[in-house]
Amino acid sequence: MIIRRALLLCALLFTPVAFSADISGTWKHAQNPAWIEIRLEEGSATVVRNDKYPDRVGRKVLKDLQADKSKQGLWHGLIYAEKLGEYKNVEVSLPEADRMLIKGKVGFMSRTVEWVRVDTIR
């Protein structure tokens, strides 16, 4: 019984850490028909499909992504601001294993967009 409780405690303590440590993979915008692929080893994300704006496929939308050393599940980098035509500061967080929040910042204004992890692009 003690071993079973210890195993359960370990699973509860270490599972969120394992999930929050990896944002690599394919993500779908929660509201729009757009998909990105994050390659954390390259520190970037590229549009792999966008049904509304197909000309954006192949565009690098996130770059210079680096893990926050003081907070697990948080990354900082740059996001491409379409209307400005340049990269701006971004904060990426992983509140759940399959849910990502991307918060772009321009001056004192910010916008957060939710993305959902997917296995395939459909």
Predicted segments — roles?
Residues 1-7:
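Bacterial N-terminal signal peptides that target proteins for export
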